[in-house]
């Protein structure tokens, strides 16, 4: 009788072999993740650059129609307030005014033009509420991890953005009759220049400020807009696109606090109402609590910020840029040749 053949058993992986395979997979994932993250950030940075270019082109279109760049913010009279909860100081800001030129004509035509008063109505005006809670494609940079958290002051919820108009080194004084003189000291050397940027605050009578042709230093040599980061918490108003005050949708007053460059970490690099203080420095959001008088360009990109120049081109400004070069890029009429590093 023929004996039955014993079935041949298939040999499986040993525990050690499985652990080796898992370890190899983990190493490969560890090697790939940074590359994937770099690709994602590169794509986000390009998206931010494209957004800035769209804002710059919209500002040019506004000038073609109105005769000048949009004001940083329209204010009630000759004086203005910068405290975010003092709504008597608010009027439409530059972003609100150029909505029709950035594919947001319905929002402007249906809501902005229907606001009966910009003063003391943030709680009750339905149209004003629709404007400040609007979120649209060009307003935010995908690199900012906090721009989805709304600001919760001044009467309710305000959507964040990541782009700001440049008031120049004189910043807070950048209004129709404000001072343009600016002096700063670097390494013991004091330099004076005209610190006005392309944008400033105007009264109700004027809905325009400087023209591109009025940028005496050359439109390609002057920052028109830059990136900013959203505030750290719901009471930090930085990055609110519908507000015109410094830190929300405008930057400036570089010389009023500490020596500033993009993404400065020191506590005086931004002076903002309800600033969270020293906890902000590690996140490129250094600030001190005070009225909104100082804010610098900021981004979540490694090593610098995107900035749209007056001619509509977008440049990446390194965090390592010198104070002098940054100040001169921020001024539209200082009359000084740019340092080589700024070109």
Where do the protein language model's features map onto the residues?
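N-terminal leader/signal peptides at the extreme start of proteins
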Residues: 1-15, 79-80
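N-terminal single-pass transmembrane signal-anchor helix
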Residues: 9-44, 48, 54
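Non-transmembrane alpha-helical segments in soluble domains
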Residues: 16, 56, 60, 95-103, ...
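Stable alpha-helical elements in mature extracytoplasmic
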Residues: 48-51, 94, 325
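N-terminal alpha-helical signal peptides/signal-anchor transmembrane segments
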Residues: 52-66
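Ligand-binding/active-site lining segments
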Residues: 68-240
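Hydrophobic alpha-helical interface faces used for helix-helix packing
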Residues: 112, 120, 167-343
């Amino acid at each position: 009788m023929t004996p039955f053949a014993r079935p041949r058993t298939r040999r499986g992986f040993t525990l050690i072999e499985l652990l080796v395979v898992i370890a190899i997979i983990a190493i490969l994932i560890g090697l790939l993740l940074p590359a994937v993250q770099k690709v994602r950030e590169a794509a986000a940075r390009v998206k931010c650059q494209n957004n800035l270019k769209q804002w710059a082109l919209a500002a040019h279109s506004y000038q073609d129609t109105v005769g000048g760049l949009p004001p940083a913010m329209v204010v009630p009279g000759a004086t203005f307030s910068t405290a975010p909860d003092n709504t008597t100081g608010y009027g439409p800001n530059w972003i609100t005014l150029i909505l029709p030129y950035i594919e947001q004509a319905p929002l402007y035509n249906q809501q902005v033009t229907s606001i009966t008063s910009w003063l003391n109505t943030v709680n009750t005006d339905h149209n004003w509420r629709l404007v400040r809670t609007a979120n649209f494609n060009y307003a935010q940079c995908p690199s900012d991890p906090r721009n989805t958290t709304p600001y919760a002051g001044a009467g309710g919820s305000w959507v964040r953005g990541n782009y700001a108009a440049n008031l120049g080194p004189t910043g807070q004084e950048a209004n129709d009759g404000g001072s343009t003189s600016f002096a700063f000291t670097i390494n013991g050397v004091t330099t004076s220049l005209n610190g006005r940027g392309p944008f400033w605050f105007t009264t109700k009578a004027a809905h325009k400020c400087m023209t591109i042709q009025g940028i005496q230093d050359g439109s390609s040599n002057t920052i028109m807009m830059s990136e900013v980061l959203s505030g750290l918490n719901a009471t930090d108003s930085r990055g609110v696109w519908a507000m015109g005050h410094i830190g929300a949708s405008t930057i400036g007053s570089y010389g009023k606090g500490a020596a500033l460059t993009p993404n400065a970490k020191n506590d005086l690099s931004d002076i903002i109402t309800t600033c969270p203080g020293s906890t902000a420095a590690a996140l490129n959001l250094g600030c001190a609590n005070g009225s909104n008088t100082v804010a610098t360009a900021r981004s979540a990109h490694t090593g610098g910020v995107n900035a749209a120049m007056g001619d509509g081109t977008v440049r990446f400004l390194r965090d390592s840029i010198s104070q002098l070069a940054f100040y001169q890029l921020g001024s539209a009429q200082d009359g000084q040749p740019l340092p080589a590093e700024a070109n």
